Amino acid sequence: MASGLIGRLVGTKPSKLATAARLIPARWTSTGAEAETKASSGGGRGSNLKTFQIYRWNPDNPGKPELQNYQIDLKDCGPMVLDALIKIKNEMDPSLTFRRSCREGICGSCAMNIDGCNGLACLTKIQDEASETTITPLPHMFVIKDLVVDMTNFYNQYKSIEPWLKRKTPASVPAKEILQSKKDRAKLDGMYECILCACCSTSCPSYWWNPESYLGPAALLHANRWISDSRDEYTKERLEAIDDEFKLYRCHTILNCARACPKGLNPGKQITHIKQLQR
């Protein structure tokens, strides 16, 4: 259904997802139990060592989550945060669990919080000037294991807006393409590019406090994408379906969503457009 679904789950079994889910605390600190693991090249002459503090929680041994330190030589690592995670998993700690797939900012699988900002690990460069980088799961989501969060509610909200073309007029010729002008096609720019990574929704305070009732920036952006599509004939019904004080109007245009989007989209702008159509 969504591009993020193709991201493979590294190091855990899908059958344990539902039972292993746990909510990541809004605020927490590492404990004295955190371990420090050094690369074999650590301390070597001419090395450029950097510490990565990574959120760890294992459903098979439940307890308080902690930050675990890993030190790697940046001279022996790719430039992106995902490169560091893959290096840690392949060479230092195979138990580290995270999602990833395309490595090109297309699938949205590797969304996580890096130094306090949501983003894609494959598009986030390692900051050379900082001695440490802290990596945690997307905030206010149920954690399955380590950096893997449960996306079930997020995808259900996306599904609820019926993200597909709906027609009332039967096609004159079966399977015939429904055309639209270049001008109408251009109206979809800034919406169709969404990769459903959830960086925007999990950066939104309104979504944090109303995750079951507020649809969130991503789902509402897609709602406007179909509301704005000249080929769709259910505009009125789509607007009525989300005309709700919680589904739509929990958005207070804080615009954390726009700042977090790795594709440079502005969900807040699209939500404002929906509100204007509701008047």
Curated annotation (Swiss-Prot):
Pathway: Carbohydrate metabolism; tricarboxylic acid cycle; fumarate from succinate (eukaryal route): step 1/1. It catalyses: a quinone + succinate = fumarate + a quinol. [3Fe-4S] cluster binds at C204, C251, C257. It is an enzyme of class 1 (oxidoreductase). It is found in: Mitochondrion inner membrane. Coiled coil: none annotated. It is a peripheral membrane protein. GO terms for cellular component: cytosol; mitochondrial inner membrane; mitochondrion; respiratory chain complex II (succinate dehydrogenase). [2Fe-2S] cluster binds at C102, C107, C122. Residues 1-28 form a transit peptide. GO terms for molecular function: 2 iron, 2 sulfur cluster binding; 3 iron, 4 sulfur cluster binding; 4 iron, 4 sulfur cluster binding; electron transfer activity; succinate dehydrogenase (quinone) activity; succinate dehydrogenase activity; zinc ion binding. Binds 1 [2Fe-2S] cluster. It comes from the Eukaryota. GO terms for biological process: mitochondrial electron transport, succinate to ubiquinone; tricarboxylic acid cycle. Its EC number is 1.3.5.1. Residues 184-214 form the 4Fe-4S ferredoxin-type domain. Ubiquitous. Preferentially expressed in flowers and inflorescences. Residues 52-141 form the 2Fe-2S ferredoxin-type domain. Its cofactor is [2Fe-2S] cluster; [3Fe-4S] cluster; [4Fe-4S] cluster. [4Fe-4S] cluster binds at C194, C197, C200, C261. A ubiquinone binds at W209. Belongs to the succinate dehydrogenase/fumarate reductase iron-sulfur protein family. Component of complex II composed of eight subunits in plants: four classical SDH subunits SDH1, SDH2, SDH3 and SDH4 (a flavoprotein (FP), an iron-sulfur protein (IP), and a cytochrome b composed of a large and a small subunit.), as well as four subunits unknown in mitochondria from bacteria and heterotrophic eukaryotes. This is Succinate dehydrogenase [ubiquinone] iron-sulfur subunit 1, mitochondrial. The lineage of its organism: Eukaryota, Viridiplantae, Streptophyta, Embryophyta, Tracheophyta. The gene is SDH2-1.
